[in-house]
Amino acid sequence: MGLGSRSAKQRMHSDFEPHPDAEMCTACNRCVTWCPVDAIVIGPDRVAEVDYELCYGCGECVAACPFGAIAIAWKTEPASIQEKIVEHVAGVLKDKPGKIVYLSFITNVTPDCDCWHFSDAPVVADIGVLASTDIVAIDQAAYDLVTAAKGLAGTKGEGLAEGADKFQEMSGIDGTVAMEYAERKGVGVRTYELKTLA
């Protein structure tokens, strides 16, 4: 996502629309403050209103609302967004084989998207840093390590045992779709060998 232009991010997220609930909205203005494209205003009836021409579906408003008043309305399955992200990644990497080393810092693992300007408490203890020349293998390894970790007490990960898919449990979304699709597209492979350095 980091290398995607604003228009590319909009295309990746185009299947998502936030819908404020008039009954639950308190007009606290938090969603307005957090919207990166100023697509939300508090309307005359004191309810958040979204300009869908400006909104690119980042979801910051959903996470920012302390009252849960903004629902996620997907036009298609979340797997579609994961596949779109992989398509963009494949485009960025196609002319760079063997020229990139990937680092994955498995620290402060958040329950929600880390592209937002805020976060909740980490859901597992810090695990460490991974390095690889294969973007898919490093993602799979990181995913597996988080899955193998125990959820931290007092967080959204509380009660999630070692071996439980933390991301699936917290979001209801299968996070392996992107890695499976990337492997099918030839972006990388999901198999890996972990070598621990002291």
Where are these regions (language model features)?
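Extended, low-polarity segments enriched in aliphatic/aromatic residues
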Residues: 1-198
